[in-house]
From Swiss-Prot:
It catalyses: L-methionyl-tRNA(fMet) + (6R)-10-formyltetrahydrofolate = N-formyl-L-methionyl-tRNA(fMet) + (6S)-5,6,7,8-tetrahydrofolate + H(+). Belongs to the Fmt family. Attaches a formyl group to the free amino group of methionyl-tRNA(fMet). The formyl group appears to play a dual role in the initiator identity of N-formylmethionyl-tRNA by promoting its recognition by IF2 and preventing the misappropriation of this tRNA by the elongation apparatus. This is Methionyl-tRNA formyltransferase. It comes from Sorangium cellulosum (strain So ce56). Its EC number is 2.1.2.9. HAMAP family: Formyl_trans (MF_00182).
Length: 311
């Protein structure tokens, strides 16, 4: 089986390794190197690094909607193109170029959480289970028929970063156990129930803002879902305060304290009232400063009882 691989971030690396173990990978397509770090030096994406280790040719097109790129894909003579977290929408000419088209490893149990950020929105939505769906790609956004679904639980304190690692490993299992059967026609694709679909929109910075009027459980889910980017944040004295770690302190009423009020700020605990219940902030970072334990923020008088966050 000859295969092309489309992917960019770390979550896609295990799938590339798995594909290389069962197929002749004739090319890897990933996004271009991007400036990163304080020096803004160009950094290769994780998939490119792994592809070069495997000795596979890498292509990093700035644009995928060109006749030249479609011709390159067609000329590769691939039986299938496997896509996971590539980060670009592929045109029809590319989708149809391989003999069996393009198949996608999507990080949700389709048709739920179609779109660019399924891991984050599943956690924010309080889901207790997610998975990897192997699907045939069409011109829609994750709308094609599904060959296989593998499921995994989401723990009550699991963060988006942690879940991405789990799903990366699960996707590799799908590649090893299900991809060839899908390509060979042994797995029948099942159409999705489009009426049951939900959307996982591309994240914006504002999506990270904590809405203190929500319940403690909802805010906790929001914080752990936003860990990678943009981060869950509120404001204090006009500056952004990124909440890096927290847990539900109580689901009971906080004596009428307005949502966002710091109701307790001791040596080892900072508790903030929510619309229902309260959360304990464990670790946070004031804009322009290093991350600190909440107790250190209290000691430095950054957080004090009676303050109202998010004003």
């Amino acid at each position: 089986m000859r295969a092309l691989f489309f992917g960019t971030p770390a979550i896609a690396v295990p799938s590339l390794e798995a594909l290389a173990s069962i197929a002749d990978v004739v090319g890897v397509v990933c996004q271009p190197d991007r400036p990163a770090g304080r020096g803004l030096e160009l950094k290769a994406p994780p998939v490119k690094v792994k592809a070069l280790e495997l000795g596979v040719p890498v292509l990093q097109p700035e644009k995928v909607r060109t006749p030249e790129f479609a011709a390159w894909v067609a000329g590769a003579g691939a039986d299938v193109a496997l896509v996971i977290a590539y980060g670009r929408i592929l045109p029809k000419a590319v989708l149809e170029a391989p003999r069996r088209g393009c198949m996608n490893l999507h990080a949700s149990i389709l048709p739920r959480y179609r779109g660019a950020a399924p891991i984050t929105w599943a956690i924010v939505g309080g889901e207790t289970e997610t998975g990897i769906s192997l699907m045939q790609m069409d011109e829609g956004m994750d709308t094609g028929p599904v060959y296989a679904v593998r499921r995994t639980p989401i723990g009550p304190d699991t963060t988006a970063d942690e879940l991405a690692i789990d799903l990366g490993a699960l996707a590799a299992r799908v590649v090893r156990e299900d991809l060839r059967r899908a390509v060979d026609g042994e797995l029948a694709p099942t159409p999705q129930d489009h009426e049951a679909a939900t959307h996982a929109a591309l994240l914006k910075k504002e999506d990270g803002r904590i809405r203190w009027e929500r319940s403690a459980r909802q805010i906790h889910d929001h914080i752990r879902g936003m860990t990678s980017w943009p981060g869950a944040f509120t404001t204090i004295d006009g500056k952004a305060l990124k909440v890096l770690a927290a847990h539900v302190e109580s689901e009971a009423d906080q004596g009428g304290a307005p949502p966002g009020t710091v109701v307790m700020a001791g040596r080892s605990v900072v508790v903030v009232a929510c619309g229902a219940g309260a959360i304990q902030i464990v670790r946070a970072q004031v804009e322009g400063r290093k991350p600190l334990a909440a107790a250190d923020l209290v000691a430095g008088r950054t957080l004090q009882a009676g303050m109202v966050l998010g004003r």
